[in-house]
């Protein structure tokens, strides 16, 4: 029983991107780089762009967006990242990421589209 509880707890923590669990169990550091080459905000914005470009799932996009906000990025800067990666990542990747990034910014874009009388 103990083993089942352990794997379930690890899976739960991985699903919510528990940074300590990821570091302890997988040996991955999710900390923002401290090399001095990029400030934490810029590094977090680059990570958001990378998450969008590779088609990351919702939990990763929301996590990355939340980290960028915590590092001092604004909603406008994060939106700018989406626009900047569009030509390279493709419109489909960006459009697919928008609802999850918007949710992390506290904006329900899907409801807003439904409420728009002019449509999308």
What are these regions (language model features)?
Residues 50-57, 86-90:
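Short alpha-helix boundary/capping elements
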Residues 79-103:
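C-terminal structural segments of small proteins and small subunits
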Residues 73-77:
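Winged helix-turn-helix DNA-binding recognition segment
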């Amino acid at each position: 029983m103990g083993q089942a509880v352990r794997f379930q707890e690890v899976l739960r923590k991985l699903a919510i991107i528990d940074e300590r669990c990821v570091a302890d169990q997988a040996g991955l550091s999710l900390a923002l780089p401290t090399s001095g080459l990029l400030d934490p905000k810029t590094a977090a914005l680059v990570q958001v762009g990378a998450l969008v470009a590779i088609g990351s799932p919702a939990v990763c996009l929301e996590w990355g967006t939340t980290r960028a906000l915590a590092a001092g990025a604004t909603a406008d800067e994060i939106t700018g990242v989406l626009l900047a990666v569009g030509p390279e990542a493709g419109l489909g990747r960006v459009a697919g990421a928008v609802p999850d990034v918007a949710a992390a910014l506290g904006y329900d874009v899907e409801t807003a589209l439904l409420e728009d009388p002019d449509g999308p």
